[in-house]
């Protein structure tokens, strides 16, 4: 196999694969590829992987070369499909691998990191491995893996949530201060009780009580004119 020509073309792996996929014919290869999820190795192809948006998951591949000639693993990609309609939802970023040469009857391992950022739903992940074989870059699809993707639960102590809470608190505080300055002060001034000053009365004037002037008749004679009193006395 002319690996020198293949390795020279590795910088254009994606373009080469695209040309092969559109114009090339299918080739039967005796290459077995399987993978497991590093974070949840107990998940098999019959199980459903529970993934969270914003997290990264590592696929650990094992490639077995049962061909009579040497092969080379040169890249990996994949896609998320709708498991019901089989329509492609999104493609994974194509990553270059090695190249890693695999002798006949041998196996190698490599990893692929998958960034999960999808609308919460059920998907089927189908990875694809690029293999150089017989002077061609061949795309070998792997088994599908069902995955249920959900959004991450927001913690009360999440820095993003704390920042949002501070922003809202500052906003409401500013609005409250503005309302108080515009209407609050005037309202409080209009409803506050007014203290009326009490005028103090002057010092009490002592009233001298007139001593009653007694008379034989038994009534007060102080108000009777003196001339009249003298006249009455003469008559008496």
Swiss-Prot record:
Segments on the Cytoplasmic side according to the record's topology features: 183-236
Signal peptide stretch: 1-19
Pfam families for this protein: TRAP_alpha (PF03896)
Keywords: Endoplasmic reticulum, Membrane, Signal, Transmembrane, Transmembrane helix
Lumenal side: 20-161
Highest taxon of the lineage: Eukaryota
Functional description taken from the UniProt entry: Is probably involved in a pathway contributing to genomic integrity.
Family of this protein: Belongs to the IRC22 family.
Protein name as catalogued: Increased recombination centers protein 22-2
Organism: Candida tropicalis (strain ATCC MYA-3404 / T1) (Yeast)
């Amino acid at each position: 196999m002319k690996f020198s020509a293949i390795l020279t073309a590795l910088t254009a792996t994606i373009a080469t694969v695209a040309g092969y996929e559109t114009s090339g014919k299918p080739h039967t290869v005796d290459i077995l590829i399987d993978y497991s999820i590093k974070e949840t190795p107990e998940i098999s192809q019959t199980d459903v992987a529970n993934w969270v948006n914003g997290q990264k998951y590592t696929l650990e591949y094992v490639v077995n070369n049962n061909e009579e000639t040497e092969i080379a693993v040169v890249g990996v990609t994949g896609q998320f499909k709708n498991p019901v309609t089989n329509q492609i939802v999104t493609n994974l970023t194509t990553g270059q691998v090695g190249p890693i040469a695999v002798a006949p009857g041998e196996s190698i391992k490599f990893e692929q990191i998958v960034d999960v950022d999808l609308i919460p739903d059920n998907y089927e992940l189908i990875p694809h491995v690029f293999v150089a074989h017989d002077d061609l870059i061949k795309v070998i699809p792997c088994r599908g893996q069902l995955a249920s993707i959900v959004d991450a639960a927001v913690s009360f102590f999440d820095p993003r949530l704390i920042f949002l809470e501070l922003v809202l608190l500052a906003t409401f505080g500013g609005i409250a201060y503005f309302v108080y300055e515009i209407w609050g002060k005037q309202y409080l001034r209009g409803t506050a009780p007014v203290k009326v000053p009490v005028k103090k009365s002057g010092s009490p004037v002592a009233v001298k009580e007139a001593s009653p002037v007694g008379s034989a008749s038994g009534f007060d004679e102080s108000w009777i004119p003196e001339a009249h009193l003298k006249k009455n006395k003469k008559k008496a």
